[in-house]
């Protein structure tokens, strides 16, 4: 067998060639099995949503469900007073499948329904596993599936949208908390009010959290009950389609958090104990429950589960024209331990037999399927262990993700802010951390996501400014702490965003330093929405300092987008001095200069660059971003020759670099 490129590109992996080859072959064998030795495609296989669930036919309705442990199944709902009636009894087919055909007048748009499933030792109501619309009764709080066949369904206008990935600039969003008011926001409000803000801010991709239906709003959408249903608390499927269509019309791609790492325990709303069999969709024994998440773990070794999850991927791509996925909780899927209590300090930790090869196989085939359905689709892995090959091509021995989240970066910034005084911040450590990635993988860099904003944690700006955010964000009343916080907020984001090799992510509102944590309505806070919203009025108020950070973020992204193929350009460190706290690096004709020193500004600070004339094109200290304006950005900077460096074709560039300032210069000739 020819050596896979994953191993060729990293000699340290040669010792684990058997494990790597074994996983690669496992995926190939499983694909062959699922596609009947290639007689159909993986996309052909992943069409369960067209077979199972409720569908209109030319003569009426057909409904199917997979429930091998069931002895009887009845369709019950508003159309038959929620009672078991013979005419609504399903017929058992082969392979544990059940089916019923109904006349046209048996159901209508808006009807609520469930399954009453009987098994040998009992019975219970269940929402169908393949339900595409699930709603909650406002009075009883009971969830039910809903017949959704509107007379004039929304028709997507744009069938062939191509995401911009040069670079990929992601705005992470939660529809429910995207509005100013203390309530659950809607798809319609997001389209009308939030989407224009994202366009103005300069992001080219929206990542939606919490789209799959989930009973508990406070779970942030990570305890999914109904995998094919778009959450009804935000509106209708048609309103979501119009939102996605509108985003595409504005040049913005839309991806979603897809949760295939676990499922909610709920039996009536979810898949738990679906037909009296707790293991129908989930691992048996000690691997059944997730020890940290109070949820159930899918059995990726079952072909029926593989069919369910792969079909789920294709459904969202086809039905809603989504542009891809961020796969949630990938670390939990990869390891029997779910990554809990693991250090991952050595390559052997990835190949010691403690990995779930079935889950690895599923992720590999999921990536292959997504790109088979849409070659331009985007897949991102949320993975913290550093598993080699995660974002490497499948044919090279990898698992096929386009990107992996650079989860080390936010952890580094939090540790830097909380554990070190300003004088001890080391630029060499910063540069190493933001560029610490495998050469064969693209990453999504970010300073903070929703994780850092959750209750009990703090955003970067809140760690920097803390209580002064309540009292000194008015222009003219800024304290030293506020000036420091705003300066470092801009510098941290500039350093992170300009060292990307794939993409950059920001959670909504953090670009302008949104205050406080996120706390969803719960008993402990009196079911309040006060901290489950976005205070857009803060950045809109010109009398406050928030817009400085928002304006800077927009201009930073404009700079990045204006450099052709920026994410693929080489990054060359020119200089760092941890004593001075100065860092300088170069990409193409652009020089990035940072002085993290809290007290010292440097005059005629020199470093070697390509000879020429340089102009300042972005400066964190510019007064329009809340800076002091200590330099004249209109001045052109000329390099100074030095006989010692003529052979290297380098000359000195000498600058005045104020304390706590980041500057971007461009070579003009």
Language model region names:
Residues 1-62, 83-85, 89-172, 177-182, ...:
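The feature marks proteins involved in alpha-glucan
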Residues 63-67, 73, 77, 597-613:
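Surface-exposed beta-strand/loop patches in extracellular or lumenal glycoproteins
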Residues 65, 115, 173, 198, ...:
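Conserved, mostly hydrophobic/aromatic
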Residues 109-113, 588, 633-669:
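C-terminal beta-strand-rich structural cap/linker in extracellular carbohydrate-active enzymes
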Residues 135, 153, 157-165, 170, ...:
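Substrate-binding/active-site clefts of carbohydrate-active enzymes
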Residues 289-295, 300, 353, 628-652:
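Surface-exposed acidic, glycine/proline-enriched linker/cap segments
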Residues 321-323, 341-529, 561-606, 613, ...:
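Conserved alpha/beta catalytic core and glycan-binding cleft of carbohydrate-active enzymes
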Residues 367-368, 374-375, 534-573, 659-664:
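Aromatic- and carboxylate-lined catalytic core of secreted/periplasmic carbohydrate-active enzymes
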């Amino acid at each position: 067998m020819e050596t896979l490129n994953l191993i060729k590109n990293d000699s340290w992996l040669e010792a684990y060639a058997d494990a790597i080859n074994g996983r690669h072959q496992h995926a190939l064998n499983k694909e062959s099995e699922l596609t009947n030795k290639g007689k159909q495609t993986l996309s052909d296989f992943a069409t369960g949503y067209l077979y199972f669930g409720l569908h209109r036919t030319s003569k009426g309705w057909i409904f199917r469900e997979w429930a091998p442990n069931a002895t009887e199944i009845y369709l019950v709902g508003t159309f038959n007073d929620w009672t078991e009636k013979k005419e609504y009894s399903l017929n058992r087919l082969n392979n544990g499948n059940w089916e019923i055909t109904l006349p046209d007048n048996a159901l209508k748009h808006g009807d609520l329904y469930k399954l009453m499933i009987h098994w040998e030792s009992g019975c219970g109501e269940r929402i169908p596993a393949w339900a595409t619309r699930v709603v909650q009764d406002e009075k009883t709080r009971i969830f039910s599936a809903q017949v959704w066949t509107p007379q004039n369904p929304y028709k997507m206008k744009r069938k062939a949208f191509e995401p911009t990935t040069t670079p990929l600039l992601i705005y992470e969003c939660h529809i429910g908390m995207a509005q100013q008011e203390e309530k659950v926001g809607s798809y319609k409000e997001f389209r009308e009010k939030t989407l224009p803000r994202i366009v103005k801010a300069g992001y080219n991709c929206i990542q939606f959290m919490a789209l799959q239906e989930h009973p508990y709003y406070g779970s942030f959408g990570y305890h999914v009950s109904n995998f094919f249903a778009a959450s009804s608390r935000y509106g209708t499927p048609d309103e979501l389609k119009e939102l996605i269509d509108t985003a595409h019309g504005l040049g913005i791609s839309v991806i979603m958090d897809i949760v295939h790492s676990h499922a909610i325990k709920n039996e009536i709303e979810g898949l738990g104990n679906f037909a009296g069999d707790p293991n129908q969709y989930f691992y048996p024994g000690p691997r059944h429950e997730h020890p940290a998440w109070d949820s159930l773990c899918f059995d990726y070794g079952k072909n029926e589960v593989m069919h369910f999850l792969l079909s789920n991927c294709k459904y969202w791509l086809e039905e809603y024209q989504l542009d891809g996925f961020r796969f949630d909780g990938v670390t939990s899927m990869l390891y029997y331990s779910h990554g809990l209590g693991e250090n991952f300090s050595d390559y052997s930790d990835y190949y010691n037999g403690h990995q779930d090869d079935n889950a690895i196989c599923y992720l590999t085939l999921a990536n292959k399927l997504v790109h088979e359905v849409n070659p331009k689709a985007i897949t991102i892995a949320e993975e913290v262990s550093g598993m080699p090959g995660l974002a490497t091509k499948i044919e090279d021995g990898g698992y096929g993700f386009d990107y992996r989240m650079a989860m080390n970066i936010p952890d580094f910034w939090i540790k830097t802010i909380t554990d070190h005084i300003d004088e001890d911040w080391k630029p060499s450590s910063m540069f190493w951390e933001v560029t610490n990635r495998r050469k064969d993988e693209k990453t999504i860099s970010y300073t903070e996501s929703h994780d850092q904003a959750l209750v009990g944690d703090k955003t970067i700006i809140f760690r920097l400014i803390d209580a002064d955010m309540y009292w000194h964000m008015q222009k003219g009343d800024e304290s030293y702490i506020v000036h420091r916080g705003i300066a470092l907020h801009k510098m941290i984001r500039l350093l992170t965003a300009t060292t990307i090799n794939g993409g950059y992510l920001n959670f909504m509102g953090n670009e302008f330093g949104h205050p406080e944590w996120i706390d969803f309505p719960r008993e402990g806070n009196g079911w309040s929405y006060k901290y489950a919203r976005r205070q857009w009025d803060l950045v809109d108020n010109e009398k406050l300092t928030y817009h400085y950070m928002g304006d800077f973020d927009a201009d930073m992204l404009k700079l990045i987008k204006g450099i052709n193929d920026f994410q693929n350009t080489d990054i060359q460190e020119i200089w760092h001095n941890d004593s001075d706290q100065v860092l300088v690096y170069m990409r193409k004709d652009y020089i990035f200069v940072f002085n993290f020193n809290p007290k010292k500004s440097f005059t005629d600070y020199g470093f070697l660059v390509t000879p020429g004339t340089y102009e300042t094109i972005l400066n964190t200290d510019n007064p329009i971003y809340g800076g002091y304006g200590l330099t004249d950005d209109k001045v052109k900077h000329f390099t100074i020759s030095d006989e010692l460096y003529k052979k290297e074709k380098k000359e000195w560039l000498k600058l005045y670099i104020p304390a706590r300032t980041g500057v971007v210069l461009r070579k003009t000739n």
